[in-house]
Amino acid sequence: MLRPKIRVLIVDDSASVRQILTTILNADPDIEVMASAADPFAAARRLQDEIPDVIILDIEMPRMDGITFLRKIMAQRPIPVIICSTLTEERSDVMFEAFEAGAFDIVPKPRIDTTHALLEASARMCDAVKAAARARIRPRRPPRMVVEAKLTADAIMPPPVSGRARPTTERLVCIGVSTGGTEALRDVLECLPAKAPAILIVQHMPQGFTAAFAKRLDSLCEIEVREAQDGDVVVQGCAYIAPGGRHMLLQRTGQRYHIAIKDGPPVSRHRPSADVLFRSAAQYAGPNALGIIMTGMGDDGARGLLEMHKLGATTRAQDEESCVVFGMPKEAIALGGVDKVVPLAQIPREIMLWQDAKQPVPTV
């Protein structure tokens, strides 16, 4: 029995973009474009007659912007929405606003200047649509009230240097996450105390956005969150997010862990790649590492987590029920590299239980 095609509604004020996206999607045998609209009002009229499986939405449009329309969709009838806009490439705040409003994924507008770029964009868009059609779309959480911080003398001058450096860590956590990860990471990191172990994170995100993403998380969390830089010494109570477009590896010199940022080709179709991070953690931390694979499409991280598992690391995977896309965890479980499958809400507790229970193992 043939599976029904994934039905897509395209909302973009550019006729040429609508045509390019329609051509790309209709070329995939599993997808069909049911309709297109030049603005949110035309799209809303179409939605009264027919509900698509996935919506592809621009941001800058006449009469109503895409973010406002996205919020209305999520409030009335949640549908997986993929943002396709050049604005998200230029302004990181717009990207985070889209995710917070309920966007499933953000995909750059297709480039047609070269055949390679068009093929790459086509594959990325079709993959995103297929993942969105399988996704679990949940009602959005109300935004948190932000209380203005009480300032100290640090606002005027830095505190005196005590001569005592922050402790390095013998144990650390490595996390690989993709689609749905921006909100999932917030859920995890917000719950961790300042004494949490060091955490190295690969979140699939475009180049230029990870610094702003880290800064946003840092403002919400007790632990420090920063974009990783080459040579960073890994310390307790700090989370390091791999910079977009580059690989992050764990290395060790004597008793100190530090971070290496490397260029190179995409691994498992991604750069940064969770497989690269996990392999380096297996080599340099072994049983002193906790590897966690979370929501995301594809299989990045599955093989690397298995390597960590084989070299004595503790491993966890996010469960299907709490994943936006149960792709990366599913592949890791299938390979046999996962010790325990847990819901998203339990991951912070798993991290702290592991830190409190497991003694560091001497490593060479």
From Swiss-Prot:
InterPro entries: CheB-like, CheB_C, CheY-like_superfamily, Sig_transdc_resp-reg_Me-estase, Sig_transdc_resp-reg_receiver. Residues 7-124 form the Response regulatory domain. The keyword NADP does not apply. It holds the Pfam family CheB_methylest. It is found in: Cytoplasm. One of its GO terms (molecular function) is protein-glutamine glutaminase activity. It is an enzyme of class 3 (hydrolase). Residues 167-358 form the CheB-type methylesterase domain. Keywords: Chemotaxis, Cytoplasm, Hydrolase, Phosphoprotein. Its EC number is 3.1.1.61, 3.5.1.44. One of its GO terms (biological process) is chemotaxis. It catalyses: [protein]-L-glutamate 5-O-methyl ester + H2O = L-glutamyl-[protein] + methanol + H(+); L-glutaminyl-[protein] + H2O = L-glutamyl-[protein] + NH4(+). GO terms for cellular component: cytoplasm. Transmembrane segments: none annotated. The keyword Membrane does not apply. Phosphorylated by CheA. Phosphorylation of the N-terminal regulatory domain activates the methylesterase activity. The active site is at S178, H204, D300. Belongs to the CheB family. Contains a C-terminal catalytic domain, and an N-terminal region which modulates catalytic activity. PANTHER family: PROTEIN-GLUTAMATE METHYLESTERASE/PROTEIN-GLUTAMINE GLUTAMINASE, PROTEIN-GLUTAMATE METHYLESTERASE_PROTEIN-GLUTAMINE GLUTAMINASE. HAMAP family: CheB_chemtxs. This is Protein-glutamate methylesterase/protein-glutamine glutaminase 3. It comes from Rhodopseudomonas palustris (strain BisB18).
